């Protein structure tokens, strides 16, 4: 039994033909041109690093959940109860002339005061680290602003935080370059081009030194446990040095927080770049055949230390990156390879002598 015919369907618009892509004209390369041909490199790092920046900003500004507020309220109530009970014990000991109990209350008050002071100090340092993110946002707004009146005060505050004296030659050149007719964008831009590179150069030197030490230590040390302890210690020292250069005093919790943010940023944006830099060396210069396995591991550890220093520099820096002033792993890669080759050649030539 045949199926009945389906009713006709009328369309409101005619069917649109799919556009066909036009092919480009054929190009024929000569033998000489084929040797010098190089494919265009596609760099996807800005998009990846934008995602990483969003993740870091989200971690730097955590949301205040209800449970966290309840815990903080409970701790505050408990602290007030402890203080009230201590005051009551002190009054009772004074009235009953119980000098032993009064001495115990005084000792407890000193301990509590020291604990509260350390907590306040740690909170202030952690708050200072969070304020650096707000300063970067403010600097980014000023770099796109055409208003007048905020740029100079903002830059003077940054110079004071970094410990740059008013009589410093770089700051004097900045003062000589600015005038009243310039807007905030131009003033902050001059500060970023004249004053900020001085601190960035010091941070680059620290990163190069610590990365070279990590590379050489891994290359010559036969103990993996010693290598791990040394790398962890030097990486923490590097973070402290960079934070000090940019005028941030790190406490215990702020140091842990910065280290966690740096590792988070590396996990998001650094893995692909690290693999690309190491792979570039292995493929182009055949390092696997020229260097030993320990030397290759040393280069990897040095690049990881350099990457950590770059991200710590980015999080501690009060200004956003402008144009191409951000340091790249390639800047440190060639230096690490040269230093490692020179060290290995010296170690091979010394026994022959």
Swiss-Prot record:
It is found in: Cell inner membrane. Residues 1-35 are annotated as: Disordered. The chain crosses the membrane at residues 70-90, 100-120, 213-233. Residues 1-19 have a biased composition (Basic and acidic residues). It holds the Pfam family DUF697. It is a multi-pass membrane protein. GO terms for cellular component: plasma membrane. Keywords: Cell inner membrane, Cell membrane, Membrane, Transmembrane, Transmembrane helix. InterPro entries: DUF697 (IPR021147), UPF0283 (IPR006507). NCBIfam families: hyp_HI0043. Belongs to the UPF0283 family. This is UPF0283 membrane protein YcjF. The gene is ycjF.
């Amino acid at each position: 039994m045949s199926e009945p015919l389906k009713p006709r369907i009328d369309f409101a618009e005619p069917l649109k033909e799919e556009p066909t892509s036009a092919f480009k004209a054929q190009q024929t390369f000569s033998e000489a041109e084929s040797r010098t041909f190089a494919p265009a490199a596609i760099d996807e790092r800005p998009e990846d690093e934008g995602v990483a920046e969003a993740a870091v900003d989200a971690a730097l500004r955590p949301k205040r959940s209800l449970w966290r507020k309840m815990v903080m309220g409970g701790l505050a109530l408990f602290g007030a109860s402890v203080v009230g009970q201590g005051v009551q014990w002190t009054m009772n000991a004074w009235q009953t002339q119980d000098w032993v109990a009064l001495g115990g209350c005084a000792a407890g008050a000193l301990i509590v005061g020291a604990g509260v002071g350390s907590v306040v100090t740690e909170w202030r340092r952690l708050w200072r680290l969070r304020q650096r993110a707000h300063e970067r946002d403010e600097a980014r707004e000023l770099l796109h602003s055409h208003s007048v009146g905020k740029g100079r005060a903002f830059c003077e505050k940054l110079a004071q935080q970094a410990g740059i004296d008013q009589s410093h030659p770089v700051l004097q050149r900045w003062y000589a370059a600015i005038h009243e007719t310039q807007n905030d964008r131009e003033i902050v831009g001059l500060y970023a081009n004249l004053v900020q590179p001085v601190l960035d150069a010091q941070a680059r030197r620290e990163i190069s030194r610590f990365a070279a030490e990590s590379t050489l230590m891994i290359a010559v040390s036969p103990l993996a446990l010693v290598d791990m302890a040394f790398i962890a210690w030097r990486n923490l020292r590097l973070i402290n040095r960079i934070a000090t250069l940019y005028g941030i005093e790190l406490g215990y919790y702020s140091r842990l927080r910065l280290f966690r943010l740096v590792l988070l940023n590396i996990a998001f944006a650094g893995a692909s770049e690290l693999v690309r830099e190491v792979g570039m060396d292995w493929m182009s210069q055949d390092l696997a055949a020229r260097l030993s396995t320990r030397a290759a591991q040393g280069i990897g550890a040095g690049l990881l230390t350099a990457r950590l220093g770059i991200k710590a520099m980015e999080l501690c820096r009060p200004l956003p990156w402008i144009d191409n002033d951000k340091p790249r792993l390639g800047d440190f890669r060639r230096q690490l390879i040269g230093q490692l080759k020179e060290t290995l050649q010296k170690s091979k030539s010394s026994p022959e002598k």
